[in-house]
């Protein structure tokens, strides 16, 4: 390229990186908003965590297969149209989710199975369309960035999902805490939301309120009384696990109004009233104080969850328009030459027949053992990542006795350190390992396993360190695990070459989201039946297996262009 062409190429290269970064961040706006809406859905419709878990597992698998299918499509389709249309469809699915109760004529109360099924269908549709987010980006970046620079620049690009998730968290946090309707003066709605809370979440409140309790055996069906609901809770004590005790909690209108008055007075004075203070002021147990305060908060913001779909959906629609206006396809589409260092045999012919393209994809992806090893490794990377990301707040509060605020902060730090980890991993790959991303991945998995091992050691000895050290160790795990999360896609793109990069990333992505079978129900089953210590052992074991998988391709070349032209 001459100097003028190089300058123009550089401008378009960075334009493509920035536009696709923003575009993929918008995909997260209408992908992760469901997590923020779940508390509202539980409060208003009594949807259980089990139902959420089933839906989330299905959605994870659907997304993985969608990424694969869209990867195949992305290698044959203009990325500008592929990505912008996909984001538009995701946005429409998000908007439809918020309108579902209106369409079905369902109000506050126990949700019929029909509503859950409709929610599941809309989420599945959304995640089918979500698969059109990453594959076009993987293909474009391999066309615009030479292999020797791809790790660094794509590691920067990979921060897009963390940027999108962080901005969405701020937006949805504001929505859930400030929007919606106040139905706290409606006795009927308060009773319905009380019933929903007691039957889905009260068990944890009772367990956490008293260290002497060994296990909450059962929260019985709430019995309607004149003033509200009477709830019998059966539990055992650590001092005598064989003897089952029963305690009755009264969720009355009088108790609800007393807690609401105490909370409102504290707000007027600019104070945050803790559960212990509420229990003392209102003369009730700590468990009931926590539950009633949560019910008060939820009745003041009913319907806010809908805006967690509507506002991000509208923003994503604008993002889809922006993608259509500013994004272009390969260098050829804007009159620029292809990268010399990444040319393949398919670049030599302007018109390549389907059989030739199919044979090339078969050779570079499906018959390429390195791609299959990377896919297998991705499974273990995602098990470690999702085990911490999805279950972090739960195991930090239940197993490590952290407050919800501190646990949420720990997961946020985990995500932020992940951004730093991705960037550092990309730089190390290019400068230390000459673009061999799989070597960086190996050392990152060693670091992640060591960090989780340290966390497990501190967990077994709670008096050894402070919560700050625990959070720091977990953040270190985030720093290491996000390196492979970003680099595996880069390695797959390089090994398959730019002409099959999206297909390779689609295949690798399937294995990542197949991990939800373990990181979802697998983790929950272990925690319920054997305790959190076995969960941590399992996560460490997954990291060790991941190290061994990466070790098997230590000697692999940086990319597959020599193989493609052989």
What are these regions (language model features)?
Residues 76-87, 431-446:
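Cytoplasmic membrane-interface "Motif A"-like loop-to-helix N-cap segments
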């Amino acid at each position: 390229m001459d100097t003028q062409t190089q300058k123009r190429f550089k401008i378009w290269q960075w334009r493509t990186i920035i536009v696709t970064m923003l575009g993929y961040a918008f995909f997260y706006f209408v992908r992760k908003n469901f997590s923020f809406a779940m508390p509202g859905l539980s409060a208003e419709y009594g949807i259980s965590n089990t139902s959420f878990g089933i839906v989330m597992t299905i959605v994870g698998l659907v997304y993985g297969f969608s990424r694969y299918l869209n990867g195949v499509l992305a290698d044959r389709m203009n990325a500008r149209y592929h990505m912008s249309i996909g984001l538009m469809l995701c946005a429409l699915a998000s908007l439809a989710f918020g309108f579902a109760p209106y369409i079905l004529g369902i109000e506050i109360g126990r949700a019929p199975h029909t509503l859950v099924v409709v929610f599941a269908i809309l989420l599945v549709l959304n995640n089918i369309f979500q698969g059109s987010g990453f594959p076009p980006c993987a293909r474009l970046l391999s066309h615009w960035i030479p292999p020797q620079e791809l790790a660094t620049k794509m590691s920067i690009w990979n921060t897009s999902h963390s940027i999108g998730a962080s901005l969405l968290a701020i937006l949805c946090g504001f929505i859930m805490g400030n929007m919606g309707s106040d139905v706290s003066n409606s006795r009927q709605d308060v009773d319905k939301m009380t019933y929903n809370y007691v039957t889905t979440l009260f068990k944890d409140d009772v367990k956490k309120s008293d260290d002497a309790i060994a296990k909450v055996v059962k929260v019985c069906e709430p019995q309607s009384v004149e003033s509200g609901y009477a709830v019998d809770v059966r539990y055992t004590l650590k001092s005598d696990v064989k003897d089952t005790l029963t305690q009755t909690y009264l969720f009355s209108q009088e108790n609800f109004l007393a807690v609401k008055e105490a909370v409102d007075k504290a707000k007027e004075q600019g104070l945050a009233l803790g559960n212990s203070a509420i229990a003392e002021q209102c003369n009730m147990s700590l468990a009931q104080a926590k539950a009633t305060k949560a019910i008060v908060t939820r009745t003041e913001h009913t319907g806010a969850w809908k805006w967690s779909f509507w506002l991000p959906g509208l923003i994503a629609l604008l993002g889809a328009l922006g993608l259509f206006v500013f994004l272009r396809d390969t260098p050829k589409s804007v009159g620029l030459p292809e990268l010399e260092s990444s040319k393949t045999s398919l670049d030599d012919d302007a018109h390549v027949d389907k059989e030739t393209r199919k044979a090339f994809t078969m050779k570079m992806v499906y018959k390429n053992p390195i791609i299959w090893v990377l896919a297998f490794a991705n499974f273990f990377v995602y098990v470690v990542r999702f085990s911490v990301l999805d279950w972090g707040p739960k195991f930090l509060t239940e197993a490590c006795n952290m407050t919800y605020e501190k646990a949420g902060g720990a997961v946020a730090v985990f995500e932020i350190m992940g951004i730093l980890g991705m960037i550092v991993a990309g730089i190390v790959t290019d400068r230390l390992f000459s673009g061999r991303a799989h070597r960086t991945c190996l050392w990152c998995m060693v670091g992640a396993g060591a960090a989780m091992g340290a966390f497990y050691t501190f967990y077994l000895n709670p008096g050894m360190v402070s919560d700050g050290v625990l959070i720091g160790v977990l953040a270190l795990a985030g720093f290491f695990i996000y390196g492979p999360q970003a680099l595996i896609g880069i390695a797959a793109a390089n090994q398959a070459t730019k002409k099959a990069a999206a297909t390779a990333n689609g295949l690798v992505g399937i294995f990542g989201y197949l991990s939800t079978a373990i990181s979802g129900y697998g983790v929950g089953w272990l925690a319920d039946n054997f305790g959190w210590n076995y969960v941590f052992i399992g996560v460490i074991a997954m990291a060790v297996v991941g190290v061994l998988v990466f070790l098997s391709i230590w000697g692999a070349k940086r990319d597959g262009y020599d193989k493609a032209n052989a």
